[in-house]
Design a protein with these regions (language model features):
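Internal acidic/polar
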Residues: 89-96
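Alpha-helical promoter-recognition and RNA polymerase-docking modules of transcription initiation factors
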Residues: 1-87
Length: 96
């Protein structure tokens, strides 16, 4: 069963968990730097993922914060991976 949060409840939960974004970014600052990601862009991507994480949260499957952190880490890894692939393709074109 999915959650039945109203939009105002969802927004309140998101606002109270914005600190999770900063925590994930701090834990992964080396990855963000290595992938040459803009921190403002990363924050925005993770904020969107936070909203989706709250909307997709199923209370029967575990703790909300664990779900949020897992979703944020997954999004950051996906973003970094995409950036590295794009950077590699750019370098290959530039070398040709």
């Amino acid at each position: 069963m999915k959650n039945n949060f109203t939009i105002s409840q969802r927004n309140a939960i998101v606002e109270s968990h914005l600190w999770c974004i900063k925590a994930v970014m701090k834990q992964n600052r080396a990855l963000i730097r290595a992938a040459k990601l803009d921190t403002d862009d990363v924050y925005q991507e993770l904020a969107l993922r936070l909203i989706r994480a709250v909307m997709s949260y199923d209370p029967e499957k575990g703790d909300l914060e664990q779900h949020i952190f897992a979703q944020l880490r997954m999004e950051l890894q996906k973003t970094a991976h995409s950036s590295v692939i794009s950077l590699g393709a750019y370098r290959m074109r530039a070398a040709a």
